[in-house]
Amino acid sequence: MKFTPELESGVLIKRYKRFLADIMLPNGQEITIHCPNTGSMKNCLFPGEKVWFSTSDNPKRKYAHTWELMQTDQQHYIGINTGRANALAEEAINRQVITELLGYEHLKREVKYGSENSRIDILLTSQNRPECYIEVKSCTLLEDQMGYFPDAVTTRGQKHLRELIHMVELGHRAVLLFVVQHSAITSVKPARHIDPHYADLLEQAVANGVEVLAYKTALSPQGSLITSACKVML
């Protein structure tokens, strides 16, 4: 996934009201940009360090700029825009990078499913194979060299796990795919210390046949690309 036009940089001042962030441009100008991340962004906010943002030419947007990456002083990149995860996953499936998901003929996005008014991120189908329901999650929380999900209590994420369990019960295939958007993360673990109910549900999901995958993303101001699998610690 290439960033077009190219990203511009600034320095983070603060994030506030969840969806906004103030940054300072290289010329000293302060601007407000959109923060496309509903999580707590724990351990992802470093005031005074570099941010990278995209620019939209849509005149109807209140904020023309969108925060895409955080670049730490240790030169690690963090994908701030969680909305990119689904597109990265779709691209990786089409490039046959995610080997566990090979062999399907058709891919659909945002398909209604389940019993709790949900939409699945990706649905893979093929003749003579069970449908494959894939829920995509962006993992950015780094603690003690370990990646954790979620970074805040997520009732929505809990609902998605229940839906995946239900799909397996109906005879389908169900996959939880963590797209790792932090260059320092090498393995992923459920954040029981943050959302114990989610961790319990994930254990239940695995016991009932839901598959859990995690794949690393190469991040840079030029573009982002899912590259390889990383370990899931359950």
Curated annotation (Swiss-Prot):
UniProt xrefs under InterPro entries: SfsA (IPR005224), SfsA_C (IPR040452), SfsA_N (IPR041465)
GO MF terms held by the record: DNA binding
Pfam families: SfsA (PF03749), SfsA_N (PF17746)
The organism's place on the tree of life at top rank: Bacteria
PANTHER family from the UniProt entry: SUGAR FERMENTATION STIMULATION PROTEIN A
Family the UniProt entry places it in: Belongs to the SfsA family.
Protein name (Swiss-Prot/TrEMBL): Sugar fermentation stimulation protein homolog
UniProt organism field: Shewanella frigidimarina (strain NCIMB 400)
Gene name of the record: sfsA
